[in-house]
Structure formats: C-alpha cells, structure tokens
Amino acid sequence: MTEKLAILWPEIFLFIATCLVMITGQWPSRAIRQFTPWICVVALLLAFFGAMTSPATQGMFPAIIPYAKMVIAFVGLLILLLLSGTVDRQIEVDVDKGKLFQSIRSNRGEFYAFFMFSLTGLMLTASADDLIWLFLALELTSLPTYIMVAMSRDEDSSLESAVKYFFLGALSAAIFLYGFALIYGATGTTDLNEIAAVFAADGISSIGMMGLLMAVIGVSFKIAAVPMHFYTPDVYQGAASPVSAMLAFVPKTAGFIALMFLLGTAGWGFGPSGGHLPVPIEATLWIMAALTMTVGNVLALLQSSVKRILAYSSIAHSGYMLVGIIAGPGLPGGPFYENGLAALLFYLFTYGVMTVGTFAVLASLEHRNGKEADHIDDIRGICKSHPVLGWTFVITVLSMLGFPPLLGFIGKLGLFTAGIAAGHYALIVILGINSAIAACYYLRLVAVSYIDDSEKSKDPVYATPFFLRPTAG
C-alpha cells in the first residue's frame, strides 16, 4: 500500500488542484479567478518532480511509469498555457464594462477542473496494473474531454462535435470493456501481471485471444486509428484550437499506454526467433497501422481547413506510432534504437510538443468577429505579417513532417530503426511512402504561410496577445 501511494503522488497533486480550481474559478474576486490557471501550473510542476523522484515499481514495464508521467506533466503544462483564456472571455469583458460577475454563467472553474481530471486519468492509466483500474482510468481521461469540446466555443458546431464524440466514445468503451470481460473469463483474474503469467504458462485460449482483439479495437478509438477514426476531423474542427490540441495528445497517449499494457500480457516472444506478437494480434495491428497512416495522409491532401488537415495528420501519426507497438521492446538489454516501445514513448513526447505548437499558432490568429483562423487562406503570408507566429508554425509543421534535424525527425527515426530491427520491412516501406505523401500537404502549409498575397482576403486575421492568455484566463 505504501509503495502504491508513493507512485501516486503526481495524481494526488493533480486531484487536489482539481478541487481548488472548481472553487477559485467561481470566486467573485477577479484576481482570485485569474489565479485559477496558476494553481494548475503549480500542480503540474509538482506532478513532474513527483514522477521524477517516484520509486521503481515491480510492474510489467517499470521504466514506463515515471517517464510517461513526466511527459504527461510537461506536455500538459504546454496545453494549459494554450487553454488559458479559452472560456469566459466575453464575461470578463462585460466585467470590465462594469457589469456584475455572475458565477452561474461562468465555465472557468469547470473547464480547468475537467482538464485536470483528464490529466489525472491519463497519469492513472500509466500507473495501471489491473483491468478494472485501466478501464476507469481510460474513462476518467475521456469523459471530461466530451464536455470540454461542448463548452470550448459558443457555437452549434461544438455541441454537434461533442455529441458525436460522446456516442462513438461510449461505443468504443463498450467494445473494450467486453474485451476485458473475456480476458477475465479466460484467466480468472484482472491483475495484468497475473494475466501475463497465465498466458505464459497455459497459452492464450481462443476466448483470451478474442478478448485481446476486442480490447485492441475498442482502444483504437482513443488513438483515432482506422476503423475508429471517423469522429476526428469533425471534432477537431468543431472544438476550439486549444481543446483540439488537447484531444490530439491526451486520449491518444492514454490509448497507446493502454495498448502497451494489454499487449504486454501476451508478450512479444512469438515467432521462430521471438520478437513478435501472437499472429492474430500482430496481423490486426499491422493492417490497422498500414490503413491508418494511409487513410490519414491521403484524406489530408483533400482538405482546405487547417484543423481538418491536422486532424487527418493526427490519424496518420497514430499509424506511425503503431509501428512501435508492433516492433515491441526488442531483446532485454538491447540498444535503444531497437526498442519500439521506447521509440513510441519518445514519439509521443515529440508529437505532443509539435501539436501544441501548431495549434497555438491557430489559437493566436482570429478574425475581427472573434472567430478562429481555420481556412488555409487564413495563414497565407503569416511569416511576413506575423513573423513569430509564422515561423513557429513553419518549424512545427516541418517537425511533424520529420524534417532533419528537427525533433520530429529524431522521433520518426526511432520508429524506423525499431521496425527494421524487428524485421517488419514491408511496414517500414509503407511508413516511408506515407511520409512522402505527408510531405505534400505539410509543404503546402509551409508554402502558403510564407507566400505574401496582398489580395488574399477581405477578412484578414489578427494576432491575439498569446503571452497574456494565462492572465486573461
């Protein structure tokens, strides 16, 4: 019990902050309301250092827990800075004009509380050692995001996206929960380590295999992988850009961590020389990875909305990351570049940073009527009209492409080397072809942002003071 409590300090810090922001967000004093995001900042910093100093565990992947929590806290802090000022902007403008603050109209407290609840669930996912714990952690990660999508913008499109997101999320939860039930029926336990021991001793029964396959398909919704990807472009476009950035990282990270734990029960010791998942699972993931990266990249070519391009790009990145899952951890004590799970975790970090940077630029560009920049013409020439935002956008987009020597190149290189080391040459060829396809729409975004067209629009975009967002929110 003491050991379990020691590794849960990051979650405890976040939960305490969640309780506090629900109070401060509704406080009549504006100074206290503006302090709300800073409570989250302190909690995330404490969670980061708590994860850094947490003791080693005896779980399935003992090195994953502290590293994953540090990544979650760091990227969560970046997302928090982006989320600040997303809600209650008009309410604060009305207060400046002398109107009385009405807490019943304010969403600030709930908005930050839902964000912190989601991050708490994500960290609990990384700490999971039981199927019931894993299910509850995944749902705690996902449920707040449905509400955040709905409240992020005062438009019908946000509500429509939230409803679609919720019902598909409920369907996926039912699928992977049924898979968990089959796994329990096949092994008689919900403890992940005990499940792995049963599978190792007695083999994987047909019921256990069916349970694993259903769990994988259900969790694929979290990572926006084919065939559970349909909601992604509509939800990303309907939500405010900061919330879209959160959706691109938080549920995806939870899904991949859950996949690592679930597939770790079966192990990668199959095949003539080991290093492979059971054939039905590996074949399912192989097809899913190839289709996900191909569908995402091809459909991104057809879009004129920047957020829809980034949504399909997010789908494609899930396909890339599945290569790390398929490759597995490699030989015990083997080099880093052969460890697919290590490459996956590093890629999640790089992807989180790149995604937040890209959506931060979109969140900082608004039309005169207050609507966010979204159409590809809205970013035309921003390298010249708004140099800091423009070049930030260019660098993050090139990094998502994997352009050397940027961070995204290093992350993608790890997936390539791990896949080659595991012998999945055909999948690596598909990954290379898809990277070339992705270059078409990524370079299109770069070219448009650099080209200066004085006749571009009768409704130009204006840069908002992004560095003041934390004080505004």
Predicted regions and their residues:
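Alpha-helical transmembrane segments of multi-pass membrane proteins predominantly involved
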Residues: M1-G473
